Amino acid sequence: MSKETLILLYGGRSAEREVSVLSAESVMRAVNYSRFIVKTYFITKGGEFIKTQEFTDTPAEEEKLLTNDLAESYPKISPAAIYEKDAVVFPVLHGPMGEDGSIQGFLEILRLAYVGPNILSASSTMDKLLAKHVFEAVGVPQVPYVAAFADENQAEIAQEVVEKLEFPVFVKPANMGSSVGISKVDDLADLQPALSEAYKYDNRVVIEQGVDAREIECAVLGNNSDVSATLPGEVVKDVGFYDYNSKYIDNKIQMDIPAKVSADLAQKIQEYAKKAYKAVNGAGLSRCDFFVTKDGNVYLNEVNAIPGFTQWSMYPLLWENMGLSYSDLIEKLVDLAKETFETRENHLL
């Protein structure tokens, strides 16, 4: 029986390309090579596609995916040249141009099956402002917030923050993930510099009420109504703010899996996670991040449509705790991708 082709797209144009490479390397090592051949394509910061490596067996420990200068010495290809009949694409891409619907639309034009969110779920979860409106509509609780726009009067935005929120607040670009461009602001004097930093990444910004809370995460897997959620895990930090470097570079966090919460609270988190996932028409996978306060209030922080996927990332570890290994999780995601593709193609008839 011939092997199936799994195409890994990694790198990308966003500030989160380093996370993408780490995730893609983990996937290439964990793939079931009795079932798959893995072909890898690097997307440069400029958006160019480069065919890099091909694996028919588990790579050696020291083998790395080609990136940056090394990859760019390879010939560039037309993006459409990644097409291969019956292949499944795993877009291991984070942030803009990766989990915002852009690459998903491109893959649908090519009529390729792909792992993860569709155009709608990717774009709606990537945009923090739009996502907040959707989650409000279905009754999933969130912390108070103020929307800010780069072309508006910044003094008026500051006044709205003073009237509606209490410091500390968190300033977040609306269309970015992995804590890139996010600042914790403890007083009014620091608000404008934080907004200026966020505007580097998006002209639309969310200013959220800070809460003294535990950070609890829940992994979701499935398509349509057939959706499963894990027992939650907890992010335990050695730093005051769980920023990009503490997440991926400095290793200043640890995770408790499963989280030490009551059965009732775990069930509430699972139900909110599934409700949020279905509200944005989730497909394949998502990681839903929550705040849980000392008095038991639960607030949805965000839904990550393509969560970090290294072998030490929360998403696969949550499923491992439920008895689904990293390698089996990848196979399940491929099967879900093929199911979604078949449904989409049938709807076009």
From Swiss-Prot:
- InterPro entries from the entry? ATP-grasp, ATP_grasp_subdomain_1, D-Ala_lig_Van_CS, D_ala_D_ala, Dala_Dala_lig_C, Dala_Dala_lig_N, PreATP-grasp_dom_sf
Show the disulfide pairing: none
| Annotated residues for binding of ATP | 162-217
Identify the Pfam families for this entry: Dala_Dala_lig_C (PF07478), Dala_Dala_lig_N (PF01820)
- Tell me which residues bind Mg(2+) 2: E302, N304
Q: Where in the cell is it found?
A: Cytoplasm
Recorded hits in Gene3D superfamilies, A to Z, give:
3.40.50.20, ATP-grasp fold, A domain (3.30.1490.20), ATP-grasp fold, B domain (3.30.470.20)
For the keyword Ligase, the answer is yes
Q: Name one GO biological process term.
A: regulation of cell shape
Could you say which EC number(s) this protein's record lists? Answer: 6.3.2.4
Q: Where does Mg(2+) 1 bind?
A: D289, E302
Could you tell me what the cofactor note in this record states? Binds 2 magnesium or manganese ions per subunit.
Domain of life here? Bacteria
Gene Ontology molecular-function annotations: ATP binding; D-alanine-D-alanine ligase activity; metal ion binding
Q: Which UniProt keywords apply?
A: ATP-binding, Cell shape, Cell wall biogenesis/degradation, Cytoplasm, Ligase, Magnesium, Manganese, Metal-binding, Nucleotide-binding, Peptidoglycan synthesis
Q: What positions does the domain ATP-grasp occupy?
A: 132-335
Does the UniProt entry include the keyword Ligase?
yes
Q: In which pathway does it act?
A: Cell wall biogenesis; peptidoglycan biosynthesis
Catalytic activity entry: 2 D-alanine + ATP = D-alanyl-D-alanine + ADP + phosphate + H(+)
Cofactor(s) needed, names only, are: Mg(2+); Mn(2+)
Can you quote a single GO CC term? cytosol
According to its UniProt entry, the function of this protein is described as: Cell wall formation.
Family per record: Belongs to the D-alanine--D-alanine ligase family.
Protein name (database record): D-alanine--D-alanine ligase
Q: What is the lineage of its organism?
A: Bacteria, Bacillati, Bacillota, Bacilli, Lactobacillales
Gene that this polypeptide is encoded by: ddl
